[in-house]
Amino acid sequence: MTRGRSVESVHAARGVVCRAGGAEESCVGDPVMLTFWRSAMKPFQALPLIEDGVIDEFGFGENEIALACASHGATDEHLVVVEGMLRKLDIEADALHCGAHPPFDKDAAFSLRCSGSEPGRIHNNCSGKHAGMLALARHHGWNPDGYWKLDHPVQQRIRAALR
């Protein structure tokens, strides 16, 4: 990126544009480079929440959808949303299959540490995504046990949304 005649920053990018059938249309960089989706996958993992009517059934609004689609810093604002999702599902935070770690937000981490409390699963930056997956299981009447495993109906439904 330039500002006037000065180079302000340089960004490396790789990308592939494919047709619906999978044929490569255009490419920048190595199209077969192995990469990991990580959090970039979250919006796609949340598609069934919208397509299947999960958000309507449980009254999820923009904040719940946003946390199902993104990582969060475990600020008080974020925790209220995730706790609300779990309350609407009548599910406890220990049902989330994401490990506990300190909040990514430095002020939230400091406050938690000063309170003498330990981080819980709800503080995990992925807890909104996991709450969304539990909502998908609840909506369809699927047993939530193992919802993170590839052979579980939740993961199979997410895979189907990607096709």
Residue ranges and their predicted role:
Residues D56-F58:
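Hydrophobic alpha-helical segments, chiefly the membrane-spanning helices
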Residues G61-R163:
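Active-site-adjacent helix/loop patches that line small-molecule binding or acyl-intermediate pockets
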Residues P31, T35-S39:
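Short, contiguous acidic and Ser/Thr-rich linear segments
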Residues V16, P48-L49, L136:
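Proline/glycine-anchored alpha-helix kink/cap motifs
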